[in-house]
Amino acid sequence: MTRITRHLIFIGILALLFAAGIWQDGTVAQDTKIPALSELNEDEKITEKASLGARTWIIPTPVWVIGSYDKEGKPNVMTSSWVGICCSKPASLMTCLREATYTHGNIMERKAFTVNIASESYAPYAAYVGRVSGRDVNKFETTGLTPVKSALVDAPYIKEFPLVIECKLTQTVELGLHTMFIGEIMDIKADRSILSEEGAPDIEKLKPFVFTPGSSKFYGMGKLVGNVSDLAKEAEKK
């Protein structure tokens, strides 16, 4: 069998897989049927976990609104949920953005960004700024939110959002479709109304919300589960 023949056979197999909806970009096809719980027998309900494929379904994810300036100095914000703390010394966080986003170019240009965390009452604003591009609209003008120029980094933050993290870009990591931006935390600013007696942000006062990939919904934080050290002791007894 010649190399060309083998190549044609391989292409034919791939075409059949695509037609059958079995393979898409190395993952299970989006419309692959996941058995309903009612379709499983009692043993399967206990032992079986459904295979969901290689997806970005980490449940839940934070809702961060990233602030930046474009090269003309226009303030912009966008919502990102692919985010997190990545180092304690120096205190640093990261967010991952596609190159196609307006914010990606802004951060590369200005070497800075802010993270703005909203209370539940501002959920509509977080949803909106994550669905339109700063190339097309001035999001501060359309929402009525107020941009504030940071005194520490070359980026704006949102006055109305109660918790703000100001970051200086220190590293970029190309990961494929997304770029990881690592920012050193220069300062955290918080409305005094959300602080505990100890001076730390109080989650019950802040009332943040989270995002659920797959369903594309925001959820509030719910009730207190318990103190971590107390819960750990309970598990040890069991």
Predicted regions located by residue number:
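Bacterial N-terminal signal peptides that target proteins for export
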Residues: 1-11
